Amino acid sequence: MAESQTGGGGGGSHESGGDQSPRSLNVREQDRFLPIANISRIMKRGLPLNGKIAKDAKETMQECVSEFISFVTSEASDKCQREKRKTINGDDLLWAMATLGFEDYIDPLKVYLMRYREMEGDTKGSGKGGESSAKRDGQPSQVSQFSQVPQQGSFSQGPYGNSQGSNMMVQMPGTE
């Protein structure tokens, strides 16, 4: 994983075959990838307690996840540039995922984004803050630590990654 990328992947526009922008030329590996400890922790959630993950599997997943994030973010960034905006928001990412063919993930992510904004007090999606309607009405928001989201695609739920449940639990940010 220490070798540098010199071809089709680098986090740029997926149509250009790579990112040739000045900011991508001197990117360190630690800045390009999510921390391996985080990747490993997420991967272990789908294994039995005595399950092991090979180092190369963790590194491969680390690279794939980082490339996926760059792919979706690049599409959202292109949209924002066309609209002459500088900030990518959650709605832009959902649009990018739909555009790139990841429709099965849109509905659960919309629910997650809505509940996240409720917790953050942002109902407009602008990222500028503000109060949710429940707070304005003097009522506390009824967002639980875990939100049930309808299952989409082939996402597995069970502790061993093989159950066929119809819902998945999503931990909301800030409730750990």
Swiss-Prot record:
Keyword set, alphabetical order: Acetylation, Activator, DNA-binding, Nucleus, Transcription, Transcription regulation
Protein task: Component of the NF-Y/HAP transcription factor complex. The NF-Y complex stimulates the transcription of various genes by recognizing and binding to a CCAAT motif in promoters.
Region ranges (Subunit association domain (SAD)): 61-72
Source organism phylogeny: Eukaryota, Viridiplantae, Streptophyta, Embryophyta, Tracheophyta
Chief location bin: nucleus
Name the UniProt record assigns to this protein: Nuclear transcription factor Y subunit B-10
Pfam families documented for this protein: CBFD_NFYB_HMF
Region feature (Disordered): 1-29, 121-176
GO molecular function: DNA-binding transcription activator activity, RNA polymerase II-specific; DNA-binding transcription factor activity; protein heterodimerization activity; transcription cis-regulatory region binding
Residue ranges, compositional bias (Gly residues): 1-15
Name of the gene this protein is made from: NFYB10
Similarity-based family: Belongs to the NFYB/HAP3 subunit family.
Source organism (scientific name): Arabidopsis thaliana
Modification N-acetylalanine occurs at: A2
CDD domains: HFD_NFYB
Tissue: Expressed in the whole plant, except roots.
Low complexity bias (residue ranges): 139-159
Keyword Nucleus: yes
Cell compartment(s), UniProt: Nucleus
One biological process term in Gene Ontology: glucosinolate metabolic process
Superkingdom field: Eukaryota
Subunit-level organization: Heterotrimeric transcription factor composed of three components, NF-YA, NF-YB and NF-YC. NF-YB and NF-YC must interact and dimerize for NF-YA association and DNA binding.
GO CC terms, sorted: CCAAT-binding factor complex
